[in-house]
């Protein structure tokens, strides 16, 4: 009897010690920073940017190593046009342990693209692809960065073509991970045209068009599809689409005038 009680007492002590080791008390500053972060994120979602910035700045001040606090703080700064401060916070998040966080690199790639710093955007997108190859955003951003780099190198035809083909491969991978993403499909079609692949571009435009109700596709889709038909010398179909473009009052737009010239030139041949 005594032996059983003794063993039971030892078990209780062992469990108690284990629980004590696994439990880490939350400090008052951690509790307050978590509360301020939740308030800041809620304000950010509601578009109350100044309030979000203040709350998230408090959260970061109280818990400097929480990368999610910094990521949301950076977003609040960015949406107010404080771009360099935002980039600083994201960079600080990476330095404080977020170097393997794909979301941080995705956010940086997005922001550097807006600032037209395409090489830096490509570097962060490339890192995001390495860290999380199943996230379509990583591939899309890397493809976008390459496409924009190619557009800046118009004088270097061979290199531009190589970069554009690399961009196409990234877009194809992104679309395979997010097949109904309308923005991605439109960009892929444009890249396919740039790569001299109008047949593939037309297939992409048709896939994109199928995601809308009949006649409900955006002007960009209708014009892109019609331009591609013209390049393929399918002028009867292009002229049929042109009638819809005229009904929408787009014939005098820059794209409309360019398209009208393409169709007219083809019809005269």
State where each predicted segment sits.
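Terminal, low-structured helical/coil segments at or just beyond the last alpha-helical repeat
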Residues: 211, 216-269
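Structural signature of tandem alpha-helical TPR/SEL1-like repeats
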Residues: 47-55, 80-92, 115-127, 151-173, ...
